[in-house]
Structures are given as C-alpha cells and as structure tokens.
C-alpha cells in the first residue's frame, strides 16, 4: 500500500506554527514511508477565504521547503463532484432532505437545553413522508447510524470511541446548494486516496462523523492521528500575545527555516535525547508513536538557541542567501564591502538572528555619520590620539592586507607604546566601527578594508582634536 498524507489548511489567515507543525509531521510521515504528500486548500468558507491567505500558506510551505507531490487542490473547484456524491446518497437513502425551518430548529435546541440534553437534530424529516415542491428550500442531511458506535485507533492517542447516539444527522449540503466542510473532506480523502490523516486534536470530534460517511459511501477509511495543541510558555493556547505565530513572521524576524523546522519537529516528538536534527534525520527517525499526547509549550528562547546554532553550523554561503533578504530590508548597499558569506562568518557568533546581523553590519559597507556617544566619550579621548596615529601609520604600511597582518600592526603599536592591547584596540574599534562592540578587531578592520579603515581613523583623530579644542 502506498502511503499518502495530506495537509489541508483553510485559507482564512497566515500559516501559523501549529499548522506548520501538522504539515511537517504529515510530510515527514510520507517521506519516511516513501509515500506522497498532498496539499489541499479547504476554501469552502467563501466569506473568509482570501487569495492573500492562500499565497501566505504557499509562501510558508515553500520557505520551509515542505514540497508537495500533488496539488494544490481547491475544494471550491470540486463542487460538482461533491454534489454528484450527495445526489447519489439521496438515491441510496444514506442522505435525506430536511425542510425544517430555522425557527423550529432553534425552538428544538432551546427545549433540549432546558432539559439538560445535548442539542441535536431530532430526525423529523428523516422519517417524514410529506410531499414538498421541488423548489422548496431545504438542506441535505447525512443519515447517521442510530445504533452502535464508531471506534478508531488513533495513532497518537490510542483507541477512541463515540456512540452513534451522540452524533447528529450532519448537514452535508446547505440551502444555497453548497456542500459543507465535513462532507467535502470525506470525498477529498476518498478521491485522493489518502491513507493517513494527521491533523490537530480539534478535529477529533469530526472524525466519527467522517468515518460514518466514508462507510456509507463504501469508501476505505484512512488511519487517523490527532496532534496535541501548542501552548504558550504560560500554559495557555498559543496566540499573538505570546509573540510571532505566523511562519513568515519568523522569517521576517531573522530565523532560518532549518531552525524553525528543527524546533517544530521537537515540539511534541522526540528521538532519544537528540536535539539537533538534519532534514534527512527527521525523515529517517520520524514515527507517529513517538509523538506526545500532551500539549507542548512554545519556548522562544529554545528556538533562538537553535537559530544561533544553525547560523554557525550551516555553510556560510547558504546562510548568506537568507541574509540577503534582511540586508535588502535595511537598504544596505553591499557592493563595497565583504561578501555576505564572509559577513556570516564574522558576525555569526555575536548574532542570534539574521535580522540582528543585518542591523549590525552597516559599518562594513557604509560610512557612519557619527560615533556612538557613549563609546566616543569613553574611548576617543586625547589620550587615544597617539595610539591611533601610530596604528594608522602601521596599517598604512601593510602591503598584504590580511587579518593576520592587521593583528600584527595592532600588537606592534601596543608594544611600541608599551601599553596594553586595550589602549590601542578600543579607540581603534570605535574609530572604524563607530561603536564600542564588534567582532574580533583584526578581522573587523580587515573586512572594512584598508582605505576605509584609515579614513575612519583620520575622522576619529579629527573628532579628538575638536574635543581638545573645546576643553
């Protein structure tokens, strides 16, 4: 049997991390079994579904490289198929037309609630032999079995049972002729030959209804697995107040897709004590029986730690392809300065996100208008004039511009003036970067370049001279 899974989001908003984790688990399960992964857009909610949301879902899937083998299929393009199946069910007696008014249904609901009963349709039209005009408004209901129970073996939670007496005669076609969500899902899973449905636990109550419809259609019933929800670190359901929840927001905030994938796969699944997983390892080790039944807590600090790891562990050339977008957001012209891959090597240890890296690299490519006030006050004092002049001359004399030779020039300055390296290094750092912090000074000066570094030292000396004149 060929394994076939699907990810079926509703395009009413962005791709959130919960949906991304569900997509990842479905994708991994299919890849682990050499199967196929289907993308289906469940856009039957015509009022809330938007093209922008569909694009956002696609963007998120593509950014995470969760490639699909079939689709995307759109439910709105399959209405003829759904209605053909409903008409077939009406002929076979597994569905029936219901003419009950909204007023009657509301009165029935209030009566049942007053008695402490679970509100459900009483089956009046199921047993009615009244004649109705062809154009009289009606819905179509599924004739749910009235006895017995539905049992399915959830691959994460174990056996789950629902009594058929608890289930309603579900509306499968509205008065306007449009099929309903629960019915469309059933026909889609049947037509697309889905073998395993991996989805959120909020769908558990839909499962017995869908199984009963599948059985009425004499269609194969897929295997189900319901993933627990994701909570914030306060134990409450993850929402915007916990920070970013959109996949693309994490891209915008400077996270690598590898970091988010690694974090999401571990958010409810484990393989021993291993924390870091390549994509290939995820595929190799992923099993549904290792997925936890309990809700997971989203920990941004852990994600940040993983992101920092991947910034330094992945090839700099690859990280640079993702950094490029953030550089463009900052409007930095990188034509005159180090290659982005070299920048990743320079700033990787200091920066936990690519956004932070892009925001702290401008001095490598563009001259700054002024020095950081605190850093200049502390380090660009008259006492720094001589160290800066000497190190400038030694840097000017370098014919082979390497980080090693830059280091020798700084060391030689300290030795000549018989001062510690900090007495040379800190004024030089502020002079060439405009700030009091940077990566190692020798590689920083080397990356900034000889001409630009010397120009900035002269600018710092002019700043010191002006400061002396004001005293």
UniProtKB/Swiss-Prot annotation:
It is found in: Cytoplasm. Disulfide bonds: none annotated. ATP binds at residue 240. A motif ('KMSKS' region) lies at residues 237-241. It catalyses: tRNA(Glu) + L-glutamate + ATP = L-glutamyl-tRNA(Glu) + AMP + diphosphate. Binds 1 zinc ion per subunit. GO terms for biological process: glutamyl-tRNA aminoacylation. One of its GO terms (molecular function) is tRNA binding. GO terms for cellular component: cytosol. Zn(2+) binds at residues 98, 100, 125, 127. It comes from the Bacteria. It is an enzyme of class 6 (ligase). Its cofactor is Zn(2+). Catalyzes the attachment of glutamate to tRNA(Glu) in a two-step reaction: glutamate is first activated by ATP to form Glu-AMP and then transferred to the acceptor end of tRNA(Glu). NCBIfam families: gltX_bact. Belongs to the class-I aminoacyl-tRNA synthetase family. Glutamate--tRNA ligase type 1 subfamily. This is Glutamate--tRNA ligase.
């Amino acid at each position: 049997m060929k394994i076939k899974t699907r990810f079926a989001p509703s395009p009413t908003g962005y791709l959130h991390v919960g949906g991304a984790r569900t997509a990842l688990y479905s994708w991994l399960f299919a890849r682990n079994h050499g199967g196929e992964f289907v993308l289906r857009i469940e856009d039957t909610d015509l009022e809330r579904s938007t093209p922008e949301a569909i694009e956002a879902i696609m963007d998120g899937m593509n950014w995470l490289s969760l490639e699909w083998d079939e689709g995307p299929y759109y439910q709105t393009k399959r209405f003829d198929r759904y209605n053909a199946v409903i008409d077939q069910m009406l002929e076979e007696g597994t569905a029936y037309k219901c003419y009950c008014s909204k007023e009657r249904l509301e009165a029935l609901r209030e009566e049942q609630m007053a008695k402490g009963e679970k509100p459900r349709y009483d089956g009046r039209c199921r047993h009615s032999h009244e004649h109705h005009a062809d154009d009289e408004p009606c819905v179509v209901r599924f004739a749910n079995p009235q006895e017995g129970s539905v049992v399915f073996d959830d691959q994460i939670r174990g056996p789950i049972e629902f009594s058929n007496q608890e289930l309603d005669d579900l509306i499968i076609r509205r008065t306007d002729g449009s099929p309903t969500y629960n019915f469309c899902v059933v026909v889609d899973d049947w037509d697309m030959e889905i073998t395993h449905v991996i989805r959120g636990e909020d769908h558990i109550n839909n499962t017995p209804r869908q199984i009963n419809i599948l059985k009425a259609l004499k269609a194969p019933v897929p295997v189900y697995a319901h993933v627990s929800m994701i909570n914030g670190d306060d134990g409450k359901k993850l929402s915007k107040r916990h920070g970013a929840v959109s996949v693309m927001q994490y891209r915008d905030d400077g996270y690598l897709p590898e970091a988010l994938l690694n974090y999401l796969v571990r958010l409810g699944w484990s393989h021993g004590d291993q924390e870091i997983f390549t994509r290939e390892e995820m595929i190799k080790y992923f099993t549904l029986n290792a997925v936890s039944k309990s809700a997971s807590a989203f920990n941004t600090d852990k994600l940040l730690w993983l992101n920092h790891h991947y910034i330094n562990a992945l090839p700099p050339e690859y990280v640079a392809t993702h950094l490029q977008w953030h550089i463009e957001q900052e409007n930095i012209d990188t034509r005159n300065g180090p290659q982005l891959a070299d920048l990743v090597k320079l700033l990787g240890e200091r920066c936990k996100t690519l956004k932070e890296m892009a925001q702290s690299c401008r001095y490598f490519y563009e001259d700054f208008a002024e020095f950081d006030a605190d850093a200049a006050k502390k380090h660009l004092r008259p006492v720094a004039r001589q160290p800066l002049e000497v190190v400038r001359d030694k840097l000017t004399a370098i014919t082979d511009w390497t980080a090693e030779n830059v280091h020798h020039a700084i060391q030689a300055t300290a030795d000549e003036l018989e001062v510690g390296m900090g007495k040379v290094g800190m004024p030089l750092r502020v002079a060439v970067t405009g700030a009091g912090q940077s990566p190692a000074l020798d590689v920083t000066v080397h990356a900034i370049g000889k001409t630009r570094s010397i120009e900035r030292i002269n600018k710092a000396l002019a700043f010191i001279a002006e400061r002396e004149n004001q005293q």
